[in-house]
Amino acid sequence: MSVLIETSLGDIVIDLYTEECPKTTLNFLKLCKIKYYNFAPFFNVQKDFMAQTGDPTGKGDQGQSVYGILGGSRYFPAEIHPTLKHVRRGMVSMAVAADASIETGGVSGSQFFITLGENLDYLDGKYTLFGEIAEGFDVLDKINEAYCDEQGRPFRDIRIKHTVVLDDPFPDPDGLVIPDESPLPTKEQLESMRIGEDEDLEEMGDPEELEKRVRAREAKAHALTLEMIGDLPFAEVKPPENVLFVCKLNPVTRDEDLEMIFSRFGLIHSCEIIRDRQTGDSLSYAFVEFENKEDAEEAYFKMQSVLIDDRRIHVDFSQSVSKLHKDWIAKRTGAGKESMGGFDNLTKRTRYREEGENNDKRDYDLVFDKGDYKRKRDEDSSRDRRRRDGSRDRYSSRRDDERSSRRRDDERSSRRRDDSREKYRRRNDSRDRHSSRRDDDSKRNR
């Protein structure tokens, strides 16, 4: 006969003395079963003595037995057993109601305490000892070390989060309503909160340092959000430092031209201009992967606002635009199955399935056998290949047309310049001939 109590500091398992104290253990089991203790605080902690809880309000003067909840008396008589002693740490006893007389045996409701010391024999015969801790002595150590005020209330809340009945030999009384899920804290319980379990008491000191901590927590939260929605493979991913993002490109700029321009800074592993999947048109940005980080840094400083194909480009590192290179990274996963984008230092967790892995059975709308599914996949692949080839042909044709048009314009301009020069030369020759005739006429007249 046991109960698991989940607290804000850890879990505790209590073994109950159901034969020696049947009425007390029945009361405790049924209160745990209806989640009566949920969100109840440890409101009285005396170091090396005891830790008291069981009052949902945390005031220390509230609470009632399961019999009172079912319409009976709020309290029930204590069950003092002469053979049960408070000799060890972790003994569990019912508290005595303040308005009851200890000499007459006392009465109890819902409050109980756990001993934090040994050989507390002066408690024997005064309180109903109905169980002992079987697991969770490390939690008792944490409770014993809690900082408390003068009344014994911990400054940082220590609360019961949940109770689980592991073994219950007693049938449920008539009228006992067991909730389907844990009830929400009441307004009175929320108002009794002090320092939350997740609040950091050490956040005191330099404001700049505190600001850094806050920003670090926010960044981690944002990264986890991006991981959940799929924008990041995992929250701790580090962007590659040897990859440059190049934007504001001319749509006619080719991959090989861009690679040739950037290759003067160092060896390039890949240079890819990102294109539209449907049309194959350039999206005017690219990623250039260098072998060394130093080469990427040099290219970053020297290629900023450089004119390429009549366009001034902008260069940045890829961590500034992590969303844009997601597709590019995904295409490189074939180079290293256990890495992100082919980089060894970007190892992805196996906690989630990677995109592209085990896709043979992702189609849940229709069920195919392996042969049918393979034929369907081959047809889809062939159709996609034809679509890509058509897109490339359209793009190549459009690019050739643009170059032909530019060549024709250059030829026309050259012809115009030649015509203008010929006209100018003829005009000068004509002037020279007229001038020579006038000189000859002048000489004859003399």
Swiss-Prot record:
Comp. bias regions, Basic and acidic residues: 390-446
CC annotations in GO: nucleus
Major location (coarse): nucleus
Subcellular localization: Nucleus
Sorted UniProt keywords: Isomerase, Nucleus, RNA-binding, Rotamase
Domain of life: Eukaryota
Catalytic activities: [protein]-peptidylproline (omega=180) = [protein]-peptidylproline (omega=0)
Annotated stretches, region: Disordered: 375-446
RRM domain ranges (all copies): 242-320
Pfam families: Pro_isomerase, RRM_1
InterPro entries, alphabetized: CRIP, Cyclophilin-like_dom_sf, Cyclophilin-type_PPIase_dom, Cyclophilin_PPIL4, Nucleotide-bd_a/b_plait_sf, RBD_domain_sf, RRM_dom
PPIase cyclophilin-type domain sequence ranges: 1-165
Stated family: Belongs to the cyclophilin-type PPIase family. PPIL4 subfamily.
UniProt-recorded name of the protein: Peptidyl-prolyl cis-trans isomerase-like 4
Species whose genome carries this gene: Rhizopus delemar (strain RA 99-880 / ATCC MYA-4621 / FGSC 9543 / NRRL 43880) (Mucormycosis agent)
Lineage of origin: Eukaryota, Fungi, Fungi incertae sedis, Mucoromycota, Mucoromycotina
Gene name as annotated: cyp13
